[in-house]
Regions:
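Active-site-proximal alpha-helix that buttresses catalytic centers in soluble enzyme cores
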Residues: 2-71
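Phosphate-handling substructures
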Residues: 61-139
């Protein structure tokens, strides 16, 4: 199975929708994805991700299935005490690096001003719910790997979501620290990341990264780019 992860286009965060630029980016992403053999499209329930998914759905004449657990994750203080930059994951990862911490060693997340961040429970939520979703697709989590238990795993699906929730998903699937993924991937608008999993029924498998953070479709072809 191929799982294509796509971040939403340039957003109006206040109204939770795409800006005109975001719609341009989403249309370009749809053209980029039209020949990938996508058989099913999933999306976060948030408007900016769903509107991005609709562009691809229209090109492929498909419907979009919403996955509630892939809404953007929350961050902030869990106890009202001080937390760096309100717990923003990308700012937090950069600050940890500036202090000399390794993002591959999560020991620094256990102490102030990092430990009281609600983002940790959010990441755990995405991990638990993603296991249920992946099992419905034919992949049952066993330890750090996945057992192929389905009969229809030789296909391609797409999931449109957010920088935070997709990083949480990748963190779990790839067995890598969440804050490391925030720094290592940090997806652009409509950036595409592709994972592949073996379809050999009964076997154990782990995801292979085929593409990471590919946003060439909005960096060329006349579509402006804006962070």
């Amino acid at each position: 199975m191929k799982i294509i992860l796509v971040r939403h286009g340039h957003p109006d965060y206040i109204n939770d929708c795409l800006t005109p630029l975001g719609h341009e980016q989403a249309a370009k992403a749809a053209l980029r994805l039209k020949d990938e053999g996508i058989e099913k499209i999933y999306s976060s329930p948030f408007g900016r991700a769903y509107e991005t998914a609709l562009h691809t759905a229209e090109v492929l004449s498909q419907n979009v299935t919403k996955l509630d657990f892939m809404h953007e994750i929350r961050w902030g203080s869990s106890d009202g005490k001080e937390i760096y930059k309100e717990g923003h994951p990308w700012d937090t990862s950069l600050y940890a690096i500036s202090l000399g911490h390794s993002l591959m060693d999560e020991g620094w997340t256990k102490s102030s001003p990092f430990s009281n961040n609600i983002v940790f429970s959010e990441v755990e939520r995405v991990a638990a719910e993603s296991d249920k979703w992946l099992e419905s697709l034919g992949y049952r989590r066993e330890g750090a790997n996945y057992r192929v238990v389905g009969d229809d795993t030789d296909r391609t699906i797409a999931l449109f979501s957010h920088g935070g929730s997709s990083s949480a998903l990748l963190s779990h699937m790839l067995n890598l620290p969440f804050f490391y993924l925030c720094r290592a991937i940090c997806p652009d608008f409509t950036a595409i990341t592709v994972l592949s999993l073996s379809d050999e029924k009964g076997g154990l498998t782990a995801p292979m990264i085929e593409i990471a953070n590919d946003s060439r479709h909005i960096r060329s072809g006349g579509v402006s780019y804006e962070m």
